[in-house]
Curated annotation (Swiss-Prot):
GO molecular function, one term: ADP-ribosylarginine hydrolase activity
UniProt xrefs under InterPro entries: ADP-ribosylarg_hydro, ADP-ribosylglycohydrolase, Ribosyl_crysJ1, Ribosyl_crysJ1_sf
Family per record: Belongs to the ADP-ribosylglycohydrolase family.
Major place of residence: cytoplasm
Keyword Cytoplasm attributed: yes
A Gene Ontology biological process term: cardiac myofibril assembly
Keywords of the record: Cytoplasm
Localization: Cytoplasm, Myofibril, Sarcomere
PANTHER family attached to this UniProt entry: ADP-RIBOSYLGLYCOHYDROLASE, INACTIVE ADP-RIBOSYLTRANSFERASE ARH2
Gene: adprhl1
Function comment: Required for myofibril assembly and outgrowth of the cardiac chambers in the developing heart. Appears to be catalytically inactive, showing no activity against O-acetyl-ADP-ribose.
Protein name (database record): Inactive ADP-ribosyltransferase arh2
Amino acid sequence: MEKFQAAMVLGAVGDALGSRWQTCSSGSQIQQELRALGGLAALKLDAEHWPLSDGALMHMTTAEALITDYWCLEDLYRELVRLYVEAMVSLQGRVPEPSTVEGCANLKPHNFLLAWHTPFNEKGSGHGAATKAMCIGMRYWQPERLHTLVEVSIEAGRMTHNHPIGFLGSLCTALFASFAVQGRPLVSWGRELLKTLPKAEEYCRKTIRHMAEYQETWFYFEAKWQFYLEERGIEDGQSKPSFPERYDADETDRMYKRWSSEGCAGRRGHDAPMIAYDALLAAGSDWEELCRRAILHGGESSATGLISGCLFGLLHGLSAAPTGLHQDLDRREKLQDLGERLYRAAALEK
Protein backbone atom coordinates (compact mmCIF):
# COMPACT_ATOMS: atom_id res chain seq x y z
CA MET A 1 0.00 0.00 0.00
CA GLU A 2 2.85 2.39 0.81
CA LYS A 3 4.13 2.25 -2.76
CA PHE A 4 0.67 3.04 -4.15
CA GLN A 5 0.59 6.11 -1.90
CA ALA A 6 4.16 6.99 -2.91
CA ALA A 7 3.18 6.74 -6.57
CA MET A 8 0.34 9.24 -6.24
CA VAL A 9 2.44 11.62 -4.13
CA LEU A 10 5.67 11.50 -6.17
CA GLY A 11 3.74 11.79 -9.42
CA ALA A 12 2.32 15.05 -8.07
CA VAL A 13 5.80 16.14 -6.90
CA GLY A 14 7.15 15.57 -10.42
CA ASP A 15 4.24 17.50 -11.85
CA ALA A 16 4.69 20.47 -9.49
CA LEU A 17 8.45 20.63 -10.09
CA GLY A 18 8.02 20.38 -13.85
CA SER A 19 5.30 23.03 -13.92
CA ARG A 20 7.65 25.56 -12.33
CA TRP A 21 9.92 25.59 -15.39
CA GLN A 22 7.35 24.65 -18.03
CA THR A 23 7.99 27.76 -20.12
CA CYS A 24 11.80 27.42 -20.18
CA SER A 25 13.18 25.55 -23.19
CA SER A 26 16.73 25.10 -21.86
CA GLY A 27 17.50 22.24 -19.50
CA SER A 28 20.88 23.71 -18.54
CA GLN A 29 19.24 27.02 -17.56
CA ILE A 30 16.63 25.18 -15.48
CA GLN A 31 19.32 23.20 -13.66
CA GLN A 32 21.31 26.39 -13.09
CA GLU A 33 18.24 28.09 -11.55
CA LEU A 34 17.64 25.06 -9.34
CA ARG A 35 21.23 25.20 -8.06
CA ALA A 36 20.69 28.87 -7.21
CA LEU A 37 17.71 27.80 -5.08
CA GLY A 38 19.93 25.37 -3.17
CA GLY A 39 19.11 22.19 -5.10
CA LEU A 40 16.25 19.74 -4.73
CA ALA A 41 16.98 19.03 -1.06
CA ALA A 42 16.45 22.71 -0.18
CA LEU A 43 13.02 23.02 -1.81
CA LYS A 44 9.78 23.08 0.20
CA LEU A 45 6.84 22.39 -2.07
CA ASP A 46 3.48 23.83 -1.01
CA ALA A 47 0.12 24.62 -2.59
CA GLU A 48 0.71 28.36 -2.85
CA HIS A 49 4.08 28.40 -4.60
CA TRP A 50 4.12 24.96 -6.24
CA PRO A 51 0.51 24.20 -7.28
CA LEU A 52 -0.40 21.03 -9.16
CA SER A 53 -1.10 21.35 -12.88
CA ASP A 54 -4.11 20.12 -14.85
CA GLY A 55 -2.26 16.85 -15.53
CA ALA A 56 -2.01 15.86 -11.87
CA LEU A 57 -5.62 16.89 -11.23
CA MET A 58 -6.86 14.78 -14.15
CA HIS A 59 -4.84 11.81 -12.85
CA MET A 60 -6.53 12.26 -9.47
CA THR A 61 -9.91 12.54 -11.19
CA THR A 62 -9.33 9.26 -13.04
CA ALA A 63 -8.34 7.59 -9.77
CA GLU A 64 -11.55 8.91 -8.15
CA ALA A 65 -13.65 7.08 -10.74
CA LEU A 66 -11.64 3.86 -10.42
CA ILE A 67 -12.36 3.54 -6.69
CA THR A 68 -16.14 3.90 -7.05
CA ASP A 69 -18.35 0.84 -6.65
CA TYR A 70 -19.26 0.43 -10.33
CA TRP A 71 -21.10 -2.69 -11.52
CA CYS A 72 -19.65 -2.88 -15.03
CA LEU A 73 -17.14 -1.03 -17.19
CA GLU A 74 -19.89 0.98 -18.89
CA ASP A 75 -20.82 2.38 -15.47
CA LEU A 76 -17.15 3.21 -14.87
CA TYR A 77 -17.00 5.06 -18.21
CA ARG A 78 -20.10 7.09 -17.35
CA GLU A 79 -18.53 8.03 -14.01
CA LEU A 80 -15.30 9.03 -15.76
CA VAL A 81 -17.28 11.23 -18.15
CA ARG A 82 -19.14 12.90 -15.29
CA LEU A 83 -15.95 13.58 -13.33
CA TYR A 84 -13.96 14.76 -16.37
CA VAL A 85 -16.65 17.30 -17.27
CA GLU A 86 -16.81 18.48 -13.64
CA ALA A 87 -13.00 18.73 -13.56
CA MET A 88 -13.06 21.36 -16.29
CA VAL A 89 -14.51 23.75 -13.70
CA SER A 90 -11.75 23.05 -11.16
CA LEU A 91 -9.11 23.62 -13.86
CA GLN A 92 -10.17 27.23 -14.36
CA GLY A 93 -7.22 29.46 -13.56
CA ARG A 94 -4.80 26.81 -14.77
CA VAL A 95 -3.69 26.27 -18.37
CA PRO A 96 -5.03 22.83 -19.29
CA GLU A 97 -3.73 20.87 -22.24
CA PRO A 98 -5.82 21.92 -25.31
CA SER A 99 -6.71 18.34 -26.32
CA THR A 100 -8.12 17.68 -22.86
CA VAL A 101 -10.39 20.72 -23.02
CA GLU A 102 -11.59 19.90 -26.53
CA GLY A 103 -12.15 16.25 -25.64
CA CYS A 104 -14.16 17.06 -22.52
CA ALA A 105 -16.31 19.47 -24.54
CA ASN A 106 -17.43 16.49 -26.65
CA LEU A 107 -18.39 14.31 -23.68
CA LYS A 108 -22.10 13.90 -22.98
CA PRO A 109 -22.66 13.06 -19.29
CA HIS A 110 -26.47 13.17 -19.64
CA ASN A 111 -26.60 10.82 -22.64
CA PHE A 112 -26.77 7.34 -21.11
CA LEU A 113 -25.87 5.45 -24.28
CA LEU A 114 -23.37 7.79 -25.92
CA ALA A 115 -21.79 9.52 -22.90
CA TRP A 116 -18.18 8.64 -23.74
CA HIS A 117 -18.37 8.41 -27.54
CA THR A 118 -16.26 11.21 -29.04
CA PRO A 119 -15.24 11.80 -32.69
CA PHE A 120 -11.74 11.19 -34.07
CA ASN A 121 -9.62 14.25 -33.30
CA GLU A 122 -6.64 15.09 -35.52
CA LYS A 123 -5.31 17.30 -32.71
CA GLY A 124 -5.79 14.68 -29.99
CA SER A 125 -2.22 13.38 -29.97
CA GLY A 126 -1.14 15.27 -26.83
CA HIS A 127 0.26 13.84 -23.62
CA GLY A 128 -2.88 14.43 -21.53
CA ALA A 129 -4.22 10.89 -21.97
CA ALA A 130 -0.88 9.41 -20.90
CA THR A 131 -0.52 11.57 -17.78
CA LYS A 132 -3.88 10.51 -16.33
CA ALA A 133 -3.60 6.75 -16.83
CA MET A 134 -0.96 5.42 -14.40
CA CYS A 135 -3.70 4.85 -11.82
CA ILE A 136 -5.47 2.56 -14.32
CA GLY A 137 -2.44 0.27 -14.29
CA MET A 138 -2.42 0.42 -10.49
CA ARG A 139 -6.09 -0.54 -10.36
CA TYR A 140 -5.71 -3.46 -12.81
CA TRP A 141 -2.11 -4.45 -12.16
CA GLN A 142 -2.50 -8.24 -12.11
CA PRO A 143 -1.34 -10.05 -15.30
CA GLU A 144 -4.72 -11.79 -15.61
CA ARG A 145 -6.41 -8.38 -15.78
CA LEU A 146 -4.48 -7.23 -18.84
CA HIS A 147 -7.57 -7.29 -21.05
CA THR A 148 -9.39 -4.94 -18.66
CA LEU A 149 -6.34 -2.66 -18.43
CA VAL A 150 -6.17 -2.45 -22.24
CA GLU A 151 -9.87 -1.68 -22.57
CA VAL A 152 -10.13 0.88 -19.76
CA SER A 153 -6.92 2.73 -20.66
CA ILE A 154 -7.99 3.02 -24.31
CA GLU A 155 -11.53 4.17 -23.50
CA ALA A 156 -10.37 6.65 -20.83
CA GLY A 157 -7.75 7.92 -23.27
CA ARG A 158 -10.22 8.28 -26.15
CA MET A 159 -12.59 10.33 -24.00
CA THR A 160 -10.16 13.23 -24.13
CA HIS A 161 -7.67 12.22 -26.85
CA ASN A 162 -9.38 10.27 -29.62
CA HIS A 163 -6.21 9.84 -31.66
CA PRO A 164 -3.87 6.81 -31.55
CA ILE A 165 -0.81 8.79 -30.43
CA GLY A 166 -2.96 10.14 -27.60
CA PHE A 167 -4.83 7.08 -26.37
CA LEU A 168 -1.94 4.66 -26.93
CA GLY A 169 0.01 6.92 -24.57
CA SER A 170 -2.71 6.12 -22.03
CA LEU A 171 -2.25 2.39 -22.64
CA CYS A 172 1.53 2.82 -22.30
CA THR A 173 1.56 4.50 -18.88
CA ALA A 174 -1.14 2.19 -17.50
CA LEU A 175 0.83 -0.82 -18.71
CA PHE A 176 4.09 0.50 -17.23
CA ALA A 177 2.41 1.10 -13.86
CA SER A 178 1.12 -2.50 -13.83
CA PHE A 179 4.62 -3.78 -14.67
CA ALA A 180 6.05 -1.74 -11.79
CA VAL A 181 3.61 -3.30 -9.32
CA GLN A 182 4.27 -6.79 -10.73
CA GLY A 183 8.01 -6.28 -10.30
CA ARG A 184 8.86 -6.98 -13.94
CA PRO A 185 12.40 -6.02 -15.00
CA LEU A 186 12.38 -2.38 -16.08
CA VAL A 187 14.39 -3.12 -19.22
CA SER A 188 11.60 -5.40 -20.50
CA TRP A 189 8.79 -2.84 -20.34
CA GLY A 190 9.28 -1.31 -23.79
CA ARG A 191 9.32 -4.67 -25.54
CA GLU A 192 6.23 -5.77 -23.60
CA LEU A 193 4.46 -2.58 -24.71
CA LEU A 194 5.07 -3.47 -28.36
CA LYS A 195 3.85 -7.02 -27.70
CA THR A 196 0.63 -5.62 -26.20
CA LEU A 197 -0.18 -3.28 -29.12
CA PRO A 198 -1.78 -6.08 -31.23
CA LYS A 199 -4.24 -6.72 -28.36
CA ALA A 200 -5.05 -3.02 -28.32
CA GLU A 201 -5.53 -2.99 -32.09
CA GLU A 202 -7.83 -6.01 -31.90
CA TYR A 203 -9.95 -4.25 -29.27
CA CYS A 204 -10.10 -1.05 -31.33
CA ARG A 205 -11.15 -2.92 -34.48
CA LYS A 206 -14.11 -4.31 -32.56
CA THR A 207 -15.18 -0.98 -31.10
CA ILE A 208 -14.15 1.77 -33.54
CA ARG A 209 -16.39 2.03 -36.59
CA HIS A 210 -13.97 3.84 -38.93
CA MET A 211 -10.62 2.33 -38.00
CA ALA A 212 -8.95 3.35 -41.27
CA GLU A 213 -8.45 6.99 -40.21
CA TYR A 214 -6.58 5.79 -37.12
CA GLN A 215 -4.21 3.47 -38.97
CA GLU A 216 -1.44 5.82 -40.11
CA THR A 217 -0.82 7.44 -36.74
CA TRP A 218 -1.13 4.07 -35.01
CA PHE A 219 1.92 2.90 -36.98
CA TYR A 220 3.71 6.15 -36.10
CA PHE A 221 3.39 5.43 -32.36
CA GLU A 222 4.64 1.88 -32.85
CA ALA A 223 7.54 2.91 -35.09
CA LYS A 224 8.71 5.62 -32.69
CA TRP A 225 8.88 3.13 -29.83
CA GLN A 226 10.62 0.51 -31.96
CA PHE A 227 13.21 3.12 -32.97
CA TYR A 228 13.76 4.12 -29.35
CA LEU A 229 14.27 0.53 -28.16
CA GLU A 230 16.79 -0.09 -30.93
CA GLU A 231 18.63 3.14 -30.10
CA ARG A 232 19.02 2.01 -26.49
CA GLY A 233 19.82 -1.58 -27.55
CA ILE A 234 16.96 -3.06 -25.52
CA GLU A 235 14.64 -4.32 -28.26
CA ASP A 236 15.19 -7.84 -26.90
CA GLY A 237 13.83 -6.75 -23.51
CA GLN A 238 16.87 -7.95 -21.55
CA SER A 239 20.11 -6.28 -22.69
CA LYS A 240 21.68 -3.49 -20.67
CA PRO A 241 20.56 -0.11 -22.08
CA SER A 242 23.20 1.89 -23.95
CA PHE A 243 23.47 5.61 -23.14
CA PRO A 244 25.72 8.24 -24.77
CA GLU A 245 28.95 8.99 -22.90
CA ARG A 246 28.14 12.70 -22.95
CA TYR A 247 24.69 13.07 -21.50
CA ASP A 248 24.49 16.56 -20.01
CA ALA A 249 21.45 18.87 -20.05
CA ASP A 250 22.10 20.15 -23.59
CA GLU A 251 22.53 16.64 -24.99
CA THR A 252 19.38 15.54 -23.16
CA ASP A 253 17.38 18.37 -24.73
CA ARG A 254 18.70 17.50 -28.19
CA MET A 255 17.87 13.82 -27.81
CA TYR A 256 14.37 14.42 -26.44
CA LYS A 257 13.59 16.80 -29.30
CA ARG A 258 14.66 14.11 -31.74
CA TRP A 259 12.15 11.70 -30.22
CA SER A 260 9.37 14.28 -30.42
CA SER A 261 7.10 14.88 -33.40
CA GLU A 262 7.38 18.66 -33.56
CA GLY A 263 10.46 19.67 -31.64
CA CYS A 264 8.84 20.05 -28.22
CA ALA A 265 9.92 17.15 -26.04
CA GLY A 266 7.16 15.28 -24.22
CA ARG A 267 4.25 17.08 -25.85
CA ARG A 268 2.77 13.96 -27.44
CA GLY A 269 1.43 10.65 -26.20
CA HIS A 270 4.38 8.65 -27.52
CA ASP A 271 7.32 10.68 -26.21
CA ALA A 272 6.10 11.81 -22.77
CA PRO A 273 6.10 8.18 -21.51
CA MET A 274 9.29 7.53 -23.51
CA ILE A 275 11.22 10.29 -21.73
CA ALA A 276 9.91 9.08 -18.36
CA TYR A 277 10.90 5.49 -19.16
CA ASP A 278 14.34 6.50 -20.37
CA ALA A 279 14.94 8.47 -17.18
CA LEU A 280 13.89 5.51 -15.03
CA LEU A 281 16.31 3.24 -16.92
CA ALA A 282 19.18 5.68 -16.41
CA ALA A 283 18.46 6.74 -12.82
CA GLY A 284 17.75 3.45 -11.08
CA SER A 285 16.81 4.26 -7.48
CA ASP A 286 18.47 7.72 -7.56
CA TRP A 287 15.65 10.28 -7.23
CA GLU A 288 17.88 13.27 -7.97
CA GLU A 289 19.13 11.69 -11.19
CA LEU A 290 15.55 10.90 -12.20
CA CYS A 291 14.62 14.55 -11.71
CA ARG A 292 17.61 15.71 -13.74
CA ARG A 293 16.59 13.56 -16.69
CA ALA A 294 12.78 13.50 -16.52
CA ILE A 295 11.88 16.88 -15.02
CA LEU A 296 14.72 19.40 -15.38
CA HIS A 297 14.70 19.52 -19.18
CA GLY A 298 13.46 22.02 -21.74
CA GLY A 299 10.30 20.19 -22.83
CA GLU A 300 6.88 19.40 -21.34
CA SER A 301 8.44 18.72 -17.97
CA SER A 302 5.24 18.62 -15.90
CA ALA A 303 3.98 15.72 -18.05
CA THR A 304 7.22 13.74 -17.96
CA GLY A 305 7.62 14.57 -14.27
CA LEU A 306 4.14 13.29 -13.42
CA ILE A 307 4.62 9.99 -15.27
CA SER A 308 8.17 9.33 -14.06
CA GLY A 309 7.44 10.35 -10.46
CA CYS A 310 4.46 8.02 -10.26
CA LEU A 311 6.37 5.06 -11.69
CA PHE A 312 9.38 5.80 -9.46
CA GLY A 313 7.09 5.71 -6.42
CA LEU A 314 5.76 2.29 -7.43
CA LEU A 315 9.30 0.99 -7.93
CA HIS A 316 11.18 2.57 -5.03
CA GLY A 317 8.72 4.14 -2.60
CA LEU A 318 8.82 7.57 -0.98
CA SER A 319 12.00 7.41 1.09
CA ALA A 320 14.38 8.26 -1.79
CA ALA A 321 12.87 11.75 -2.22
CA PRO A 322 13.73 14.63 0.15
CA THR A 323 10.96 15.19 2.72
CA GLY A 324 10.59 18.87 1.82
CA LEU A 325 9.35 17.95 -1.63
CA HIS A 326 6.26 16.15 -0.36
CA GLN A 327 5.63 17.04 3.30
CA ASP A 328 3.40 20.06 2.54
CA LEU A 329 2.62 19.19 -1.08
CA ASP A 330 -0.58 20.53 -2.64
CA ARG A 331 -3.40 18.00 -1.90
CA ARG A 332 -1.01 15.65 -0.12
CA GLU A 333 -3.66 13.99 2.07
CA LYS A 334 -6.01 13.45 -0.86
CA LEU A 335 -3.22 11.89 -2.92
CA GLN A 336 -2.33 9.48 -0.12
CA ASP A 337 -5.98 8.56 0.35
CA LEU A 338 -6.38 7.83 -3.37
CA GLY A 339 -3.27 5.63 -3.30
CA GLU A 340 -4.62 3.63 -0.36
CA ARG A 341 -8.06 3.22 -1.92
CA LEU A 342 -6.61 2.18 -5.29
CA TYR A 343 -4.59 -0.48 -3.49
CA ARG A 344 -7.69 -1.79 -1.71
CA ALA A 345 -9.83 -1.69 -4.86
CA ALA A 346 -7.17 -3.59 -6.82
CA ALA A 347 -7.28 -6.36 -4.22
CA LEU A 348 -11.01 -6.90 -4.80
CA GLU A 349 -11.94 -8.78 -7.98
CA LYS A 350 -14.83 -7.36 -9.99
